[in-house]
């Protein structure tokens, strides 16, 4: 039986998850509708659609995983179910981070303004960069999945073992956990680096505008700022997400601490929910579609 605080926290996390699913499904529906209407899908809309679909699956997986562990943790949890959920999460989580990183690289190549020949070469060959990212995704998948299998199997064994043995193996298991997530972590670091370069580009652009004596905020600055909001929010929310997943993993060693586990679930649910609404608010197309949807809902109520 859950305590009052645990029930409230679980309700908050579940509400976050449901809102995240609705927000991501909305992005998919808008982009797919435009795809059917225009008979083509732009690169940015493809990335946003793929990101939204992967996040819907991510939310379902972490929610299912949380509920099975909360209500089966003190009894007999089906180990095969836990193992299956963990494998699916490894694949979908990797794919979700890849789409988010691809989005950051797309913004960087489209918006940033550098005269360096490497940047100009990449800007002219954006399609090849995208193909390279697909190759990198496959390579990191192949490299990290065997380690993920080891971690999942070790957790399954240690969860059924004695407490002193768990304490003895904990450091090794956490090291393996970090290495198993090196693929998503490396992709995240690429997103951080592109955000840093985009910040430099914005700073240079503002200096250039000040040197020319312009006091008006131009379109290029607004585009830079919108992209920065998306990337910085992604970085902050993904750190919270990773912390939440790490807390949930650590709670496998602290089976009596349900509250801490639910807190980790709440943190991990924040990223796929909040960032999706930030994407909607910063995209003119998605924002207009959301305003039209809200107006229709108001008309239906009246």
Swiss-Prot record:
So what family is this one in? Answer: Belongs to the G-protein coupled receptor T2R family.
Q: Which Pfam families match?
A: TAS2R
Q: Where is this protein chiefly located?
A: membrane
Report which superkingdom the organism of origin falls in.
Eukaryota
Record organism: Rattus norvegicus
Keyword check for Transferase, yes or no.
Answer: no
Q: Looking at the keywords, is tRNA processing present?
A: no
Alphabetized PANTHER family for the sequence: TASTE RECEPTOR TYPE 2, TASTE RECEPTOR TYPE 2 MEMBER 104
Can you say where in the cell this protein is located? Membrane
Topological domain ranges for the Extracellular compartment: 1-7, 65-87, 150-182, 255-257
Glycosylated residues, chain numbering: 160-161
Protein name as annotated: Taste receptor type 2 member 104
UniProt entry keywords in alphabetical sequence: G-protein coupled receptor, Glycoprotein, Membrane, Receptor, Sensory transduction, Taste, Transducer, Transmembrane, Transmembrane helix
Q: What does this protein do?
A: Putative taste receptor which may play a role in the perception of bitterness.
């Amino acid at each position: 039986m859950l305590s009052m605080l645990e029930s409230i926290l679980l309700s908050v996390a579940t509400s976050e998850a449901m809102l995240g699913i609705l927000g991501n499904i909305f992005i998919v529906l808008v982009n797919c509708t435009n795809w059917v209407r225009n008979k083509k899908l732009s690169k940015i809309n493809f990335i946003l659609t793929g990101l939204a679909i992967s996040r819907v699956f991510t939310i379902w997986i972490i929610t299912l995983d949380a509920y099975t562990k909360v209500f089966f943790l003190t009894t007999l949890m089906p180990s095969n179910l836990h193992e299956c959920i963990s494998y699916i999460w490894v694949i979908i989580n990797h794919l979700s981070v890849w789409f988010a990183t691809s989005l950051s690289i797309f913004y960087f190549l489209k918006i940033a303004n550098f005269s360096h020949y490497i940047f100009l070469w990449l800007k002219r060959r954006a399609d090849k960069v995208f193909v390279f990212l697909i190759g990198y995704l496959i390579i990191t998948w192949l490299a990290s999945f065997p380690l993920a299998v080891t971690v999942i199997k070790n957790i399954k064994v240690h969860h059924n073992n004695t407490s002193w043995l768990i304490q003895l193996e904990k450091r090794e298991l956490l090291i393996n956990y970090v290495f198993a997530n090196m693929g998503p972590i490396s992709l995240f670091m690429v997103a951080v680096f592109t955000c840093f370069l985009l910040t430099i580009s914005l700073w240079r652009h503002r200096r250039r505008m000040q040197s020319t004596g312009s006091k008006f905020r131009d379109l290029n600055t607004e585009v830079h700022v919108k992209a920065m909001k998306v990337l910085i929010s992604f970085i902050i929310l993904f750190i919270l997400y990773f912390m939440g997943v790490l807390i949930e993993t650590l709670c496998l060693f602290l089976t009596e601490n349900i509250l801490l586990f639910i807190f980790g679930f709440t943190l991990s649910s924040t990223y796929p929910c909040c960032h999706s609404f930030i994407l909607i608010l910063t995209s003119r197309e998605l924002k207009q579609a959301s305003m039209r949807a809200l107006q229709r809902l108001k008309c239906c109520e009246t």
